[in-house]
A protein has these predicted regions:
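Nucleotide-sugar-dependent
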Residues: 15-18, 70-74, 82-105, 114-126
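Conserved donor-binding/catalytic core segment of Leloir-type glycosyltransferases
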Residues: 1-17, 24-27
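Short alpha-helix at the nucleotide-sugar/activated-sugar donor binding site of glycosyltransferases
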Residues: 108
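A charged, aromatic-enriched C-terminal amphipathic alpha-helix characteristic of glycosyltransferases
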Residues: 138-141, 155-186
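Conserved acidic donor-binding segment of nucleotide-sugar-dependent glycosyltransferases
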Residues: 101, 119, 131-141, 149-154
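A structural motif in glycosyltransferase catalytic domains
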Residues: 6, 19-23, 39, 143, ...
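Nucleotide-activated donor-binding/catalytic signature segment of Leloir-type glycosyltransferases, i.e.
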Residues: 3, 38-43, 48-78, 91
């Protein structure tokens, strides 16, 4: 069912907004002869009018204030692709290279296919690529090409919905993480008790 709905939820600082503009531009070009994709952005961040104009044309792209997580989950259910993005500029690329955004876990758990658009050396991108849990785009030049590929072969979305869900269950199940954390804390507490006696 068209249009294919893409959703981004999170901060757009550290020049993530620039990556979102690349995506918005590609969508606008593809939608030239009819709406094939839409992009919804949910964020607490405020942007200037020039940026807002590029991210909120009310046809291809829609810019919204952040919403509570329970409401966001409903928006994910209405969407096809959840985005994870980082900036491509050198300074910001280096500042997030070793980080792993908790938003990745939200994306994997969203019920959507996940699309990562960032430098291939970024920690989250490398993880998603290794796990084959996301549609991975490592340069802005490939965004339009990938979206056209998805439009002509929408089964890619269902394949990556399944892969994202499987990765989330395999590696990020909340109960398992809580158990592991509890065990870690108990080990630390035990060691501290042992050494203080």
């Amino acid at each position: 069912v068209y249009p294919i709905k893409i959703i981004y939820a999170g901060g757009i600082y550290l020049n993530r907004w620039k990556t979102l503009i690349h995506i918005a531009k590609a969508i606008k070009e593809i939608n030239n002869e009819g709406i094939k994709f839409t992009l919804d952005i949910y964020t607490n961040n405020v942007v200037n009018k020039k940026i807002l104009k590029k991210l909120n044309d009310n046809t291809n792209c829609f810019f919204h204030k952040a919403i509570p997580f329970e409401q966001l989950k409903k928006e994910y259910l209405k969407s096809d692709i959840a985005l994870h993005v980082e900036s491509f500029d050198v300074k910001n690329r280096l500042s997030v290279r070793m980080s792993f955004s908790t938003k990745i876990i939200d994306c994997l758990d969203s019920g959507c296919a996940v699309m990562a658009v960032c430098d291939k050396k970024q920690g989250g991108f490398a993880y998603l690529k290794k796990e084959d849990a996301a549609i991975c785009i490592e340069t802005p030049k490939k965004i339009k090409w990938m979206l056209e590929r998805i439009y002509s072969n929408p089964s890619i979305i269902n394949d990556y919905k399944k892969k994202a869900l499987e990765c989330g269950i395999r590696n990020h199940k909340k109960n398992d993480i809580c158990k592991e954390l509890k065990m870690d804390f108990e080990r630390i507490a035990y060691k501290n008790d042992y050494f203080t006696d």
